[in-house]
Amino acid sequence: MKRIFVLLAALAAGIVSVPAHAADIGVVFLHGKWGMSGPKSPIGPLTQALEKAGHIVDAPEMPWSRGRAYDRDIEGALAEIDAAVKRLKGKGAQRIIVGGQSLGANVALIYGTRRDGLAGIVVTAPGHTPELAAIKDVVAADFARARKMVTDGKGDVKDKFIDVNQGRQQQVGATARVYVDWMNPDGAAVIPKSVAALKPGVPLLWVVGAEDAMAKRGEGYAFAKAPAHPKNAYKVIGGGHADAPTGAAQEVVAWLKGL
């Protein structure tokens, strides 16, 4: 009992250092394309590091997961993030960070353009670039076919369409309307467009692996278009696309601590 009293007194006096604000921050973290959110997934080490630091974390399975393969459009994905935010607030989170890896990072940016009140956005190895040749040229025929289906009133008809993930290709089953939404080279998933449209006053952390193709595009591709903020940070770490969340874990924890 005496030891408990001493500890409480020390806490009250500020002698014992604890991350008092950590539990106030809730983080929605979104997995990459064809991925999942479990402990052994590419984002697992990062979400675990966030929890260890005292943050409340929600890492939902999203419409682009291995098992779902674009079963909802972009607005539907944002609604699922809304649900995750609600869960975090129900657990006591007062400030909300939205982040992700690869396509998850892309959608975190889209969310930041359409929702108010975020405390920050974290993107690690941002990916899915439908405006660039690596995706645009590969999906061109299927995109044109899907767009014609939409024009012909068959937008809700499901079919097989090609998808690309870091050079790997596979067919996905999706409705024509949803496929067009995700693959549109002039649409919402164009990263530079999202960054330029982020809400002022929301800081952005961008972390990319040196071996990732995105790193070669540099800050000018998208990051430099973000609204100015003293906490904006662009970090290049070791590694490539898939292992960026693991390598970024301490960078993200430190950045959140500084907010």
Regions found by a protein language model. Give the residues of each.
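Sec/Tat signal peptide C-region and signal peptidase I cleavage site
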Residues: V16-A22
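Short, surface-exposed "cap/lid" segments of acyl-processing enzymes
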Residues: I25-L50, M62-P63
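Alpha/beta-hydrolase active-site loop
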Residues: D71-K91
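Primarily recognizes the serine-hydrolase "nucleophile elbow" in alpha/beta-hydrolase
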Residues: R87, R95-R145
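Accessory cap/linker subdomain of secreted extracellular hydrolases
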Residues: T124-S194
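Short beta-strand/loop motif that positions the catalytic acidic residue
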Residues: L198-P200, W206-V208
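Conserved alpha/beta-hydrolase "acid-adjacent" motif
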Residues: A213-E219, A244
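Catalytic active-site module of serine/aspartate enzymes centered on a nucleophile-bearing elbow/loop
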Residues: K235-L259
